[in-house]
């Protein structure tokens, strides 16, 4: 799929997103600048749209980086324990720093996400049986252990209601003044683009990268820091969005290959389009109520994930 088609789809869905919601807004309301309707647009609809695009782009690119560095197509922030570690970090910030600002919570979540990701990579190094399906299963089990610890302490300290908002992604609470920290993902995405060629070389293996004169560990650490920071920002602002970083890079690699320089723009655009489409679907299925983005992406993403697994097995046969 060409970039211009993805870009056109993004524009069309973005315009549709502005007009879909409980409060009816028409094109004439915008043309005549209806004060009440425009207030809804600027306080709720526009911040929601921006956060959807930023989250979709950044999480998809995070998944692509993780798959390249781990050399496994089914590794992502969801299947490597990164998102679960970030969630644990948010809980720790609620327990220990009750008056912490969103930035301070994000830093704690980042530290935990980075620690969890590094731990997963260390586990990965020690596993001799590196089957494409086995590795993400290990990551899912690792993430479930962290998630269980999070739930235990949330119940113990009566914070289960607080942490529930981070268990499942939801854009319905995104409003002006409550999402701006997500903008920090933008420079991280830019750095990912600048390091695209290095990530591609690192994906060839440590020996290959070192022979080419590249500092493999430095590139690996930069990639993991980018993934961990983005995961912390998205979990803190929106909540967990499953499968996104897993399925989007796999879909793009089918028609663009594995070179990050070529696939990054397509991954970013398709990620934004996919999340935006799922969000719109969640808003119209049971209108005037809405389904959370975590549930919508989870249902659709799991189906796509199964298709990718079967497609891989078919080609292997």
Residue ranges of predicted features:
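Alpha-helical transmembrane segments in inner-membrane proteins
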Residues: 1-317
């Amino acid at each position: 799929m060409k970039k211009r088609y993805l870009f056109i789809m993004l524009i069309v869905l973005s315009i549709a997103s502005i007009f879909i919601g409980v409060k009816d807004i028409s094109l004439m309301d915008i043309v005549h600048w209806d004060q009440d309707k425009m207030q809804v647009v600027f306080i709720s609809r526009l911040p929601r749209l921006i956060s959807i695009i930023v989250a979709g782009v950044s999480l998809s690119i995070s998944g692509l980086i993780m798959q390249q560095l781990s050399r496994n197509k089914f590794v992502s922030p969801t299947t490597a324990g990164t998102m679960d570690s970030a969630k644990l970090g948010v809980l720790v910030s609620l327990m220990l720093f009750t008056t912490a600002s969103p930035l301070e919570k994000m830093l704690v979540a980042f530290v935990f996400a980075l620690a969890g990701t590094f731990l997963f990579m260390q586990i990965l190094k020690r596993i001799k049986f590196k089957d494409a399906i086995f590795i993400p299963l290990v990551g899912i089990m690792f993430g479930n252990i962290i998630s269980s610890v999070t739930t235990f302490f949330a119940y113990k300290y009566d914070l289960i209601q607080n942490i529930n908002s981070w268990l499942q992604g939801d854009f319905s609470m995104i409003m002006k003044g409550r999402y701006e920290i997500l903008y920090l993902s933008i420079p991280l995405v830019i750095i990912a683009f600048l390091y695209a060629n290095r990530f591609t070389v690192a994906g060839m293996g440590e020996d290959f990268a070192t022979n080419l004169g590249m500092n493999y560990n430095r590139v690996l650490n930069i990639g993991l820091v980018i993934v961990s920071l983005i995961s912390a920002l998205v979990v803190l602002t929106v909540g967990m969005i499953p499968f996104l970083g897993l399925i989007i890079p796999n879909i793009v690699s089918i028609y663009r290959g594995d070179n990050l320089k070529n696939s990054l723009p397509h991954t970013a655009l398709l990620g934004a389009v996919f999340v935006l489409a799922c969000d719109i679907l969640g808003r119209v299925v049971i209108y005037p109520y809405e389904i959370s983005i975590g549930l919508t992406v989870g249902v659709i993403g799991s189906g796509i994930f199964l298709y990718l697994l079967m497609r891989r097995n078919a080609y292997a046969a």
